[in-house]
């Protein structure tokens, strides 16, 4: 090592090399030493050739020989002696020689010495490095782990129009692959290829596999010709498989099968894993015909069938609502001697619960004959718990939950998520503490501490989480997901972020579920306003978003009507090799449909199909609703027929949407046809369908028929849930609030609908008092029955309070509020807004103000608007103006009705300048006052000789495309023209 450095030092010294011919007398003495150190006759002849070429003035040829000798040197000392020999013989080294020396030093494990040589002898002597030197420095800098500098040198070579060597190009591409920067690596490959160079085969293979593994399908296909040209034979089987799995990952099942067949033609064996993977893709695309064809092909070829194959097919059928076919595959599985496992039962139990057949799902759970004990599987329990809850069996759901915990099963964050849906709000941290105690007890084997005092519950939850983290990092990640969900449901994202940071410091890797909860909360709190702020937060959190993250982001962006940003998310996913899900497209289509942008919704639906993403039932239903909502009945009907054809047997969800949709569109006959098909398929109308129909007929004023349907639910053993009660009560309260009784809109065909819904029992009797549905006594009677029938949640409590208020029973409303709070249910903004509105209608504005100021909640637009309108009704314009300013400081603008009410109040009070400012505020928000209020204000301004302001308002009216009211227009124009000066 010291000898090598000493020899290299000779080149670092600043010395001028002569270019004149040296005397022949000097040659023997110099050459003798060199020849004595030479390794053989070949090297001696090369050195002699260098001298001869130098003497003849053929310096470029001499330097080429020098470069080749350096490249062929077996040690640093040999390379250094050759270079020294050349300089001593008057041949100055050029860039190619310097490049060869740098490369040789690096190859021999001296990249640091090579860099020093480059800095002193090349840069230090003012030599502009050419492509040869830069190419060698790429090699050197990669070895020094200074990749950015190496990449910059390679870019300089390419920019100068030269071709980098395969070595340097392959090193840079390899390092990019090490950093998972496969798209950059492919771009580098393309640039090098364009310059006439390339990569080594090993590097091409690595890049190809990386592109395939990360879903960059187009780029991987772009490399195929290069790989085939390099191998000059069929692709190796591992590259075939990489491309095959890439096709599957991107949802290109047809292309994957074509490659699949090509492999078999080339004589490669296609294994069971590849068959199963392709089958899974066909199932994802709802193409069960092709999936079954693959299954039969596997049977023909005598593959050993395993649970994964059957689970894939069962899940495919169950997902489409084809439960009978799924059950047939389950029977085939048992018949062929393949043992079902926990995933088999998880799929089947989840599917039957989703379809509402929870009793059969429970029988499967209890009587399972699989190879694994599913009675200890948390996912099966969670599906059953949620299934019973959805069906209205709250007691059964709670019993199952307690049995699960008592049996020592460790709950997870999904269990907690279901728990939040089941139990009253505002106790999220208490529920989280129960789950954490179970994780500590059942998962970590540690008896949790008994917590009697629930004060400062956040500290206790954090203590439990810390105990779990010290015992098991994986369970700690689950516990963290539970806690972040609890905190985010309370909008406490700061505490959630703090918990994540602390757990990371304890060595816990948070689940994506934790980050996704925080991302959603940040959107809801308007912390994330655009994509730039989203990117910053993701970078700060240092996590890789998954598909669920992108779905949350798209949903929140669509709620803000920022569809351009939502489409940008899809583009970003595709660039990263991620395939946007059908749920992401459905969210955008639904948002467009609500805005009446049907053409754009159609284009998005078409784009989804072009991307190879097959719509599921929900996507079809969203598109059908978009057509129906916007009066495109023919298109809706065509799509309905396509759904029925495509899904063979639609699910209960699909039938529910179709039947209720046709009834709402007034197409009762069509609704009855699909109800018949639903019954023929063995599916029963569920609580969702009944509730939708009840809501529709209530809006039409047909209370008798609505109550008939409500009673029929009980006769058909369909338990009324919270939403059914809320729908019924809300319809009654709307009727009571109307000044004039609404005429019942008779819809032909409803009796046919009723007859189909009646099964075996006689029609339920209708209460005699139903005709007096608008009376206060009837309202109290209904509320009493509801309170006896179901344990209300917060939303039903609010509906009941609305009923008391509508009946003028404020005292009873407050009594109900008090009992609700004793049950541990915390009132929300809606509760207080209902009471405020009732006080205002009762003529008690002061109590409404006290309620507004006494609430601990941050007011929203509805609460502000309710009080603002009340102040205007009580002719308190200055208080109303002050409230509007408070709203605007909070970042909330009044809605159009509130602005109109305030404008009327200000005009009535002759506060014209304040009214002018309100109109200008409205115009800035693209809200235009009604012509009557606008005209009234202009008239008052003219009367007060404030013609400048009157003309300004007149200009705003013209800008909005409206005109003054005809009754006052001539007089107003005359007054405006009396003074021409603005």
Curated annotation (Swiss-Prot):
Domain of life: Eukaryota
Gene3D superfamilies named in the record: Tetratricopeptide repeat domain
Keywords of this entry: Repeat
Entry-linked Pfam families: PPR, PPR_2, PPR_3
PPR repeat locations: 94-129, 130-164, 165-199, 200-234, 236-270, 271-305, 306-340, 341-376, 377-411, 412-446, 476-510, 511-545, 546-580, 581-615, 616-650, 651-685, 686-720, 721-755, 759-789, 793-827, 828-858, 860-894, 895-929, 930-964
Ranges that cross the membrane: none
InterPro entries associated with the record: Pentatricopeptide_rpt, PPR-containing_protein, TPR-like_helical_dom_sf
UniProt family annotation: Belongs to the PPR family. P subfamily.
Protein name per Swiss-Prot or TrEMBL: Pentatricopeptide repeat-containing protein At5g62370
């Amino acid at each position: 090592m010291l000898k090598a450095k000493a020899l290299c030092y000779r080149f670092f010294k600043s010395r001028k090399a002569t270019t004149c011919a040296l005397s022949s007398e000097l040659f023997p003495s110099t050459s003798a030493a060199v020849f004595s150190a030479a390794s053989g006759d070949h090297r001696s002849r090369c050195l002699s050739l260098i001298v001869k070429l130098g003497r003849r003035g053929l310096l470029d040829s001499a330097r080429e020989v020098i470069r080749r000798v350096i490249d062929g040197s077996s040690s640093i000392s040999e390379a250094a002696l050759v270079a020294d020999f050349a300089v001593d013989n008057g041949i100055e080294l050029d860039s190619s020689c310097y490049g060869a020396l740098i490369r040789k030093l690096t190859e021999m494990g001296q990249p640091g010495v090579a860099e020093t040589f480059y800095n002193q002898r090349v840069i230090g002597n003012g030599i502009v490095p050419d492509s040869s030197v830069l190419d060698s420095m790429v090699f050197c800098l990669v070895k020094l782990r200074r990749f950015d500098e190496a990449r910059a040198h390679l870019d300089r070579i390419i920019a100068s129009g030269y071709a980098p060597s395969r070595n340097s190009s392959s090193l840079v591409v390899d390092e990019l692959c090490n950093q998972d920067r496969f798209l950059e690596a492919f771009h580098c490959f393309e640039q090098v290829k364009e310059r006439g160079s390339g990569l080594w085969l090993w590097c091409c293979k690595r890049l190809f596999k990386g592109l395939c593994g990360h879903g960059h399908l187009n780029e991987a296909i772009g490399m195929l010709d290069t790989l085939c040209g390099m191998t000059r034979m069929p692709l190796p089987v591992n590259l075939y498989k990489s491309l095959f799995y890439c096709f599957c990952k991107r949802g290109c099942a047809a292309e994957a099968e074509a490659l699949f067949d090509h492999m078999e033609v080339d004589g490669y064996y296609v294994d069971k894993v590849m068959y199963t993977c392709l089958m899974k893709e066909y199932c994802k695309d709802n193409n069960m015909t092709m999936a079954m064809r693959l299954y039969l092909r596997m049977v023909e070829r005598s593959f050993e069938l395993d649970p994964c194959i059957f689970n894939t097919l069962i899940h495919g059928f169950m997902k489409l609502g084809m439960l009978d076919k799924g059950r047939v595959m389950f029977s085939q599985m048992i018949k062929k001697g393949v043992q079902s496992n926990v995933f088999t039962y998880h799929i089947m139990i989840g599917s039957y619960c989703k379809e509402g057949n929870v009793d059969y799902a429970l029988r499967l759970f209890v009587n399972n004959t699989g190879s694994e004990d599913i009675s200890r599987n948390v996912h099966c329990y969670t599906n059953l718990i949620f299934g019973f809850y959805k069906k209205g069996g709250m007691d059964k759901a709670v019993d199952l939950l307690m049995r699960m915990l008592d049996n020592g099963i460790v709950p997870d964050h999904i269990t907690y998520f279901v728990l939040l849906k089941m139990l009253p709000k505002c106790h999220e941290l208490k529920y989280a503490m129960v789950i954490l105690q179970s994780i500590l007890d059942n998962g970590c084997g540690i008896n949790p501490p008994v917590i009697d005092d629930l004060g400062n519950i956040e500290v206790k939850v954090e203590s439990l989480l810390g105990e779990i983290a010290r015992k098991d990092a994986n369970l700690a990640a689950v516990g963290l997901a539970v806690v972040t969900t609890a905190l985010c449901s309370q909008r406490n994202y700061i505490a959630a972020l703090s918990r994540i940071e602390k757990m990371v410091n304890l060595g816990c890797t948070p689940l994506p579920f934790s980050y996704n909860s925080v991302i959603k909360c940040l959107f809801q709190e308007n912390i994330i306003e655009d994509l730039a702020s989203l990117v910053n937060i993701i970078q700060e959190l240092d996590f890789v978003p998954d598909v669920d993250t992108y779905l949350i982001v798209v949903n929140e962006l669509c709620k803000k009507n920022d569809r351009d940003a939502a489409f940008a998310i899809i583009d970003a996913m595709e660039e990263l090799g991620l395939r946007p899900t059908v749920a992401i497209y459905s969210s955008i289509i639904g948002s467009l449909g609500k805005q009446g942008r049907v053409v754009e919704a159609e284009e998005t639906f078409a784009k989804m199909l072009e991307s190879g993403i097959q719509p599921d039932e929900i996507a079809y239903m969203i598109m059908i609703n978009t057509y129906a909502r916007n009066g495109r009945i023919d298109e809706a009907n065509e799509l309905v027929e396509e759904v029925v054809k495509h899904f063979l047997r639609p699910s209960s969800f699909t039938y529910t949407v179709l039947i209720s949709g046709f009834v709402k569109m007034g197409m009762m006959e069509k609704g009855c046809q699909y109800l018949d098909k639903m019954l023929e398929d063995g599916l029963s109308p569920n609580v969702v369908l009944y509730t939708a129909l009840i809501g529709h007929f209530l809006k039409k004023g047909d209370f008798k028929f609505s109550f008939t349907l409500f009673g029929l639910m009980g006769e058909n053993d369909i338990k009324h849930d919270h939403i059914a009660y809320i729908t019924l009560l809300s319809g009654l309260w709307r009727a009571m609030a109307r000044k004039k009784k609404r005429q019942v809109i008779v819809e032909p065909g409803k009796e046919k609908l009723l007859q189909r819904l009646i099964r075996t029992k006689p029609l339920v009797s209708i209460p005699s008092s139903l005709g007096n549905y608008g009376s206060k006594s009837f309202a109290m009677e209904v509320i009493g029955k509801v309170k006896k029938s179901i344990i209300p949640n917060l939303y039903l409590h609010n509906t009941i309070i609305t009923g008391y208020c509508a009946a003028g029973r404020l005292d009873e409303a407050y009594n109900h509020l008090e009992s609700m709070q004793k049950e541990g249910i915390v009132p929300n903004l809606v509760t207080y807004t209902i009471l405020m509105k009732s006080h205002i209608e009762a003529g008690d504005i002061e109590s409404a103000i006290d309620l507004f100021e006494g609430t601990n909640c941050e007011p929203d637009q509805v609460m502000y608007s309710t009080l603002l309108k009340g102040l205007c009704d009580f002719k308190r314009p200055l208080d109303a103006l002050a409230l509007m300013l408070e709203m605007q400081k909070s970042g909330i603008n009044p809605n159009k009705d509130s602005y109109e009410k305030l404008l009327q109040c200000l005009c009535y009070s002759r506060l014209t300048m304040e009214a002018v400012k309100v109109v200008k505020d409205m115009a800035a928000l693209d809200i235009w006052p009604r012509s009557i209020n606008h005209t009234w204000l202009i008239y008052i301004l003219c009367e007060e000789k404030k013609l400048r302001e009157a003309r300004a308002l007149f200009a705003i009216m013209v800008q909005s495309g409206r005109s003054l009211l005809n009754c006052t227009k001539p007089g107003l124009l005359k007054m405006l023209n009396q003074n021409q000066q603005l």
